């Protein structure tokens, strides 16, 4: 699974801390996913991030198996 988190955050002018807080995950965890977009994460965390970004799973994460 790959992700577009960084691109979406930048295009919306958001802060990593804001998204992490709204997703209910640590800033460090979100930063890890941004810096290593091929890193996998749980479906639960992926959904939390998508909800915080107000974007569908298919737009934020690619190659979802």
Q: What spans do the regions from the language model cover?
A:
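A short, Lys/Arg-rich alpha-helix, primarily the initiator
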Residues: 1-15
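Residue-level detection of the helix-turn-helix DNA-binding "recognition helix"
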Residues: 10, 24, 35, 65
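The alpha-helix within a helix-turn-helix
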Residues: 9, 20, 50
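Short C-terminal boundary/hinge segments that cap the last helix of small helical domains
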Residues: 54-65
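Recognition helix of helix-turn-helix/homeodomain-like DNA-binding domains
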Residues: 25-39
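Short, basic-rich loop-to-helix N-cap that marks the start of a DNA-contacting helix
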Residues: 38-48
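Key DNA-contact positions within bacterial/archaeal DNA-binding proteins
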Residues: 17, 28, 58
């Amino acid at each position: 699974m790959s992700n577009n988190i960084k691109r979406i955050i930048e295009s919306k002018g958001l802060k990593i801390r804001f998204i992490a807080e709204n997703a209910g995950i640590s800033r460090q965890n979100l930063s890890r996913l941004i810096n290593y977009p091929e890193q996998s994460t749980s479906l639960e965390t992926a959904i939390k991030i998508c909800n915080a970004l107000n974007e569908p799973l298919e737009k934020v994460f690619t190659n979802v198996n």
